[in-house]
Amino acid sequence: MRFKIPFLPKPALVPVLRLQGGIGTSSRGLSDAGLAPLIERAFKSKPAAVALVINSPGGSPVQSSLIAARIRRLSLEKNVPVHAFVEDIAASGGYWLACAADQIWVDDSSILGSIGVIFSSFGFQDLMARQGVERRVVTAGKSKSFADPFLAQKPADIDRIRALQTPIHHAFIAHVKARRGARLADQDLFNADVWVGQQAVDLGLADGVAHLVPKMKALYGDKVCLQPLGQKRGLLSRLGVHMAEDMLSTVEERAMRAHFGM
């Protein structure tokens, strides 16, 4: 028979939420809809804190914003601090997620930053010409064939892409400034550059070099209870129905990581 001693304090509870992979709405991507149940659960049990383990090269700015906003809202509503621990990378949208935390911790070799916006595509017009293929397009609306990969790139298209990127970039910058505040260095941190480990700390993009378990023990006691929370794979996913989409998502994530030499 077990007896509970009521006056002994319970160990601090810290749910651990892993945010790994590209950010987007594919079956493998990190999305607000997919993560919402886990994020809500993390803040539900009156924890001492919530820990985010981040390993993401980025992705959708909208999903990054929605996920970060949900974390911030619950943190404020429940009065629960959030700590982010960056593993290999928190770049672009991955760093957007990290900034949802009150404090960001990194490894000596973690890559952080890439506070910018990118648009990439391919041009097939020369290949089509060599193969004798003619492109035929009929549109209603002069912008309907905007950035068509089968036509030569137009200066007007480049200008429009930059006009679309600018407000997204400004929103990203505003989020970083709001979350990091006076901790940021006075140099240009918003040119999409990246920094490693202690460099990121020195620039105010992170708060220190630390790993999950020892840092949580230092902050919340040796008996802190770290509770991993993970996404459950659906039946269709387990049966391999989404295999093609999963493979494409993996290729996309590897391409994003390759951009940072990973």
Question: What is the predicted function of each stretch?
Answer:
Residues 111:
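Short glycine/proline-centered loop/turn elements that form peptide/ligand docking sites
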